[in-house]
């Protein structure tokens, strides 16, 4: 892929966190870096382990392939590879790949002299993943509470986990997370629609400026958050959705015991004096 005209001046030495100039180069448009090499290493090992697990299993059907966590009897210890140990090592490799990818993003930001908003945002995705495969299982005392790596088995795990707490939609953190997800979609749709409207005026009309964009929302709702503000708001909404998604899993089991009911948890609300004078 050809280098764009402005890219060459940004391809400079330095900005690395460790390793100095080792792997401080580009392959085509992609910056490598020592963390890029580590990401590829973890990813390849993880993929190889998944292939090995599949070879041990009953099928090569893509929809039915699954790398399952260990049985509850192993607790937080290491399980034999064929009995969940592969899942443990795949989780280690996945975590390593995600973390080193984020550190690669940090190095790119340092080279460009920009803020670290991209790796900061990506770290929330890492937190959500680690919550599911490390934090929640550790709090519940067994790796068996991790989710399986498989298309259908993962969906089954989501369904079974939800119904094991009565009705997961009553989980308060789940409510907040879903609200942020929907609000993120609304904000992005409004922002995207507004920008495209300003860039696609009637034939013969000039492209509209941010002043026009601000005026649309001042006319519509009486206030415009501004061109920078909408991106800050979008980042906040998206990260909040991911954060509360992780929280809703952390409190399901460690806080509300397994077999408990989220609908029943709300009895404190129904029993408030304002409803029962």
From Swiss-Prot:
Q: Which GO terms describe its biological process?
A: photosynthetic electron transport in photosystem II
Residues noted as binding (7R,8Z)-bacteriochlorophyll b in the record, renumbered to the chain: 154, 174
GO molecular function list: bacteriochlorophyll binding; electron transporter, transferring electrons within the cyclic electron transport pathway of photosynthesis activity; metal ion binding
- Entry membrane topology: Multi-pass membrane protein
Give me the residues that bind Fe cation, please.
191, 231
Instruction: Summarize the subunit comment.
Output: Reaction center is composed of four bacteriochlorophylls, two bacteriopheophytins, two ubiquinones, one iron, and three highly hydrophobic polypeptide chains (designated L, M, and H).
Q: What is this protein called?
A: Reaction center protein L chain
The major lineage groups are: Bacteria, Pseudomonadati, Pseudomonadota, Alphaproteobacteria, Hyphomicrobiales
Quote the gene name from the UniProt entry: pufL
């Amino acid at each position: 892929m050809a280098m764009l005209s402005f890219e060459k001046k940004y391809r400079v030495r330095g900005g690395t966190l460790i390793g100095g100039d080792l792997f401080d180069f580009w392959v085509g448009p992609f910056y490598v870096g020592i963390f890029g090499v580590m990401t590829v290493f973890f990813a390849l090992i993880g993929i190889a382990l998944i292939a090995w697990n599949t070879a041990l299993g009953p099928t090569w059907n893509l929809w039915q392939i699954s790398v399952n966590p260990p049985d509850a009897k192993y607790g937080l210890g290491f399980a034999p590879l064929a009995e969940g140990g592969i899942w443990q090592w795949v989780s280690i490799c996945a975590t390593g790949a995600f973390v080193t990818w984020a550190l690669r993003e940090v190095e790119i930001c340092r080279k460009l002299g920009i803020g670290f908003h991209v790796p900061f945002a990506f770290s929330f995705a890492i937190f959500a993943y680690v919550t599911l495969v490390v934090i929640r299982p550790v709090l519940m005392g067994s790796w068996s509470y991790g989710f399986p790596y498989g298309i259908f088995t993962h969906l089954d795990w989501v369904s079974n986990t939800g119904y094991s707490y009565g009705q997961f939609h009553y989980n308060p953190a789940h409510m907040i997370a879903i609200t942020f997800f929907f609000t993120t979609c609304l904000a992005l749709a409004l922002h995207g629609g507004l920008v495209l409207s300003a860039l696609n005026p009637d034939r013969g009309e000039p492209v509209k400026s941010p002043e026009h964009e601000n005026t649309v929302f001042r006319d519509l709702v009486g206030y415009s958050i501004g061109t920078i503000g909408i991106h800050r708001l979008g980042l906040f909404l998206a990260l909040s959705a991911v954060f509360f998604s992780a929280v809703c899993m952390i409190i399901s089991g460690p806080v509300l015991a397994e077999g408990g009911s989220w609908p029943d948890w709300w009895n404190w609300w129904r029993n408030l004096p304002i409803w029962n004078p």
